[in-house]
Amino acid sequence: HNVYGSDMGNEHVIPEFINRFKHLKTNYFRIQGSGNETRSFIYIDDFVSAFNLLLKKGKHLGIYNIGTSERISIKNLAKMMSDLLNKKIIFKRLPIKKGGTKSRLPNISKIKKIGFKQKISLKEGLKLLLKKV
């Protein structure tokens, strides 16, 4: 999943990167694959707002994707986080995990039709999250 916020565990990209930055002893920052793989992330507050909107306005048995159309490469995500943390990094590429995807971007057209609007950009969400760690 690409929902992020505080206390979300360490199994996904953003919390894993935060953990790596906390324990970074050199400027080398490991990323899997080329770093050009893309994802879309949604801050937990926006996710909850979208879910509540679905409860109120979603069609029974309808399928809705909750997310954003804000796409970012894994390399640019790490760079954004390093800038916010004032850390200089040099990327060290590792093989991509078996079954890894090059791009993940949800089609959110249906949820937008019932009024969903992202309120917290990725950069703003990361700032909020990094204040808490």
Model-derived segments and spans:
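Flexible, glycine-rich beta-alpha linker
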Residues: H1-I14, E37-T38
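Active-site micro-motifs of SAM-dependent methyltransferase domains
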Residues: N2-G5, N19, S49
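C-terminal substrate-binding subdomain of Rossmann-fold SDR/epimerase-dehydratase oxidoreductases
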Residues: H23-V133
